[in-house]
């Protein structure tokens, strides 16, 4: 099954048709209306996150045409196979020189303390949306905290449903759609010998994290040493998606999406070839005010000035 199959579309579907199909399926499988549809909801969101972006769609379409890749993914659950071979090492290996990579702009993200974007993080809303997404309700203590906000309180006093107020006030479906910004997309160079010998390949990465209990609501980086044993039948252009191995914040987790590149000689083992996080730091888990709407968040952190906003 490929991404078009998940959205019940032919591979010739346009961006407009993809958006229409996504909205239709999202309503059908959303956890709020279909308690058994949460996994399908995640899958169609993953599919939409790639196919709705013209650049990602073009890359994915080209990958479908590489060798017999399209036939393979229709007849084999690749993600299951990759996860069986996937390992996460908990300790750093001394021979992995992360400082060597840190100077490579194509490899690591720029520090958040140096970015030029002003993004506003609202921890309570992020947690509320994660709880709605994962279990369809908001914890009592968090609900009490949100009800103290003037805009929420005033809306609820007009006999509006609390959850619907939160969704509407802070654009729940926009945030769900933006989940793709937590994915990490990489290209991995492999040789035929490594594939034949089923070598173990290491993927050292820096992951962006905000923990639920992180007091200052600031991003920080952690090193993760991912590795997996290669399968003997890897083809050039094949995609492996490791769920929940990407960037993460306040319960939300992105995916690690790896595109295999078979080469005669490895020149650069690992390359981040697409990162929404680098292109736009204002999307996920952030509500950025515009000319028509003032910032409704309280006590939030401005990444441009590095200060909290009263």
Curated annotation (Swiss-Prot):
Observed phenotype of the null mutant: Not essential, it can be deleted.
**Disulfide bond positions:** none
Q: Name one Pfam family in it.
A: DnaJ
InterPro entries given in the database record: DnaJ_domain, DnaJ_domain_CS, Hsp70_co-chaperone_J-domain, J_dom_sf
Q: What residues does the J domain cover?
A: 1-66
Question: Taxonomically, which superkingdom?
Answer: Bacteria
Identify the keywords attached in UniProt to this record, alphabetized: Chaperone
One GO molecular function term? misfolded protein binding
SMART domains annotated for this entry?
Answer: DnaJ (SM00271)
Q: Which PANTHER family match?
A: DNAJ HOMOLOG SUBFAMILY B MEMBER 9
Q: What is this protein called?
A: DnaJ-like protein MG002
